Amino acid sequence: DVLKLFSNEYKNLYYTYVPVDTQYLSHKKLALTMGIKAARHDILLFTEADCRPIGPKWIKAMAGSYNPETDIILGFCAYRHTKGFLHKLIAYDNLTNGLQMISSALSHHPFTGNGRNLSYRKKLFFAHKGYARSLNLHAGADDLFINEVSNPANTQVQLSSDSIFKMNKVEDS
């Protein structure tokens, strides 16, 4: 009822429901699929709540990398510098994974992406039936999908300083 009331006032607010029989599916992939379906434009841009762009022109940098043949833009997300062995280990793992993703794509062998800084076309998502192959897996919304759909012709890397993100530190438990 509240959403209906708000949607009358805010014309850009959309809502839907999640059927009960989706309990064994990845909720993140289901939410992303619903958001992608509702998107009005073809170019989609993704990040995560614990990440922030370094500069103010992230959207312009990522969107500016598209040409007619490009369907995927891979961006980098660094781990925020913090003290402690755990954080250094996380930063190292993040850096090596990011370098592997970027170097593979730059050498015309793209195989993965990172949802913290990623863009792809809506039409690509639906042409490949979205997350259909991995909907029952709780991980892989970014890396498994990009592995399925990327190729040397449709994938670009954006590494300008405006396109780089930083991920906040993981909180110690």
Q: Predicted regions span which residues?
A:
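Active-site acidic short loop of glycosyltransferases
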Residues: 10, 39-42, 55, 67-68, ...
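A short, glycine-/small-residue-rich helix N-cap motif at loop->alpha-helix starts
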Residues: 21-30, 52, 138-139
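Short aromatic/hydrophobic "clamp" motif used to bind/position activated sugar donors
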Residues: 32, 44
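Conserved nucleotide-sugar donor-binding
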Residues: 40-42, 114-129
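Acidic donor-binding/catalytic loop of UDP-sugar-dependent glycosyltransferases
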Residues: 48-64
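Catalytic donor/gating beta->alpha subdomain of glycosyltransferases that bind UDP-sugars
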Residues: 66, 72-96, 123-126, 130-173
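A recurrent flexible, glycine/aromatic-enriched loop bordering the glycosyltransferase active site
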Residues: 79-80, 100-119, 162-167
